[in-house]
Amino acid sequence: MTREEARRRINELRDLIRYHNYRYYVLADPEISDAEYDRLLRELKELEERFPEFKSPDSPTEQVGARPLEPTFRPVRHPTRMYSLDNAFTYEEVLAFEERLERALGRKRPFLYTVEHKVDGLSVNLYYEEGVLVFGATRGDGEVGEEVTQNLLTIPTIPRRLKGVPDRLEVRGEVYMPIEAFLRLNEELEERGEKVFKNPRNAAAGSLRQKDPRVTAKRGLRATFYALGLGLEESGLKSQYELLLWLKEKGFPVEHGYEKALGAEGVEEVYRRFLAQRHALPFEADGVVVKLDDLALWRELGYTARAPRFALAYKFPAEEKETRLLDVVFQVGRTGRVTPVGVLEPVFIEGSEVSRVTLHNESYIEELDIRIGDWVLVHKAGGVIPEVLRVLKERRTGEERPIRWPETCPECGHRLVKEGKVHRCPNPLCPAKRFEAIRHYASRKAMDIEGLGEKLIERLLEKGLVRDVADLYHLRKEDLLGLERMGEKSAQNLLRQIEESKHRGLERLLYALGLPGVGEVLARNLARRFGTMDRLLEASLEELLEVEEVGELTARAILETLKDPAFRDLVRRLKEAGVSMESKEEVSDLLSGLTFVLTGELSRPREEVKALLQRLGAKVTDSVSRKTSYLVVGENPGSKLEKARALGVAVLTEEEFWRFLKEKGAPVPA
């Protein structure tokens, strides 16, 4: 490569990487995979090393992240800079890292390291003064981030107050979305025809940057902490391992794995072990972070413009494969929603063959601009669900075909209806809807009918033995014995499981019946609020809106279903069959008609107190108004206390609150 060619390629790479930094760090909507980004950055770094005359302090190799062009939140300067990490992809690069340490420190290796999971989330910085949280911010460009304090405080494990810490303290960590929460969120977004997230990291970033903290609170975010900025010297800590234990002791969640390792060989052993456990983790990890354990050596080594010299990110191999989209088929779910599924040329990803991939909904297809015949880059989102990362448009030949949505249901032939970006089959007798409804009803998280698998459901429907879930409770042993591969013992076991499912409670039943927008959490909230199916069936829109996590669209959809004669008939038949229609949690009318607001820090988790009040029939709201009956005040109350006094609302200290409940005859936690 000539000098001029190198200059042009370096400038091209810098522009490209800056663009992708903005997509990743600011918009939380990357266009390329992590592996592709790493390749671009490595190419730029190698060219800058070969042609040092073109190095520049504003190069992406010398900078961290990206600063928002138009901040959604208030920009805030970090008291001390937040750095990125240099990457290693092979054992040889880890060995080279240790050799650099040996030369820089003038000491013989091996060195002692702490090796930690590299959680794939969003880096944040918490700043405390005299033990009180002042703000929480995203990393941004390392010097200036966005203040997201209120959204961070929706993560219940983040402490607001600390004891026995330096007067000024920065605590650094990662906000992430557990894989289970990510899959659940995407399912809800897909059901509504909205844009889904590509991976848990994007979902975490998008959720943390919501303007409304109540939306953030519903997303199931978690956090794990691993570093100090300001206050590290004053802490008196001697090692990274000790620092992690100190963070735990002070009440910070340290949810990632970590181990000590001696030398590059020891690091490799831990890396291999963590890699093997990767898909058993509740979060996405894209590698390990290797840090010298001795903090005194950190001071000797210092930092480059971009990263510490004493630490390294040792990345897991990227499991991304190129393949072709051969066709698209359409599947019908239990609500009648039609989902496009891509048929791929089979590829092997993370231990299994992938030949199908969900294309979610019309919004997703339009955004990707994906066509039949396209080459695509595929990975497993959350290490579980095959997903298209991007379309390789540069490989198009002109023979690719656009995806056409069917006008009629692929299962029953009924004309589809379109609701926003969602296509649905409205036919209540559609066999696919019946199959999916029964399969969902019997699933482990719903009524948990062990032995009622997909093949058996198909046979029951084919033979006309069941039409819907209520028919399950009228099956007889002789009905089952007439089915292929069904013996006496299997039939008895299945009937016993069906009988046991009658007693799962209203929480599980509401989830099992597939009310629109109702997942496990919302089903539990509805059961807790109303207590019985009869009460729920008579609920008004206003009452549904009082339930935690119910927005107006969901409330209207639930209400429409509750008023549907077919749904009411199904509930009646289930009730006649002996299925429990009551919550397993006791609900009373003891505080019916009263409205509570909670403020400040209580001795028990706020959600627990809120749930208790709701079980006693009270309404719990977030803001004080003239309709508020009582404001319950914990330590460090906010402006709600002043507003309550101005409006003449009754105020209870926490001690008075528990005494009030006892006097009412309510069960009070010990």
From Swiss-Prot:
GO CC entries: cytosol
GO BP term, example: DNA replication
Domain of life: Bacteria
CC cofactor: Mg(2+)
Active site: 118 (n6-amp-lysine intermediate)
One protein family per Pfam: DNA_ligase_ZBD
Protein name, as recorded: DNA ligase
Organism: Thermus filiformis
Gene that this sequence comes from: ligA
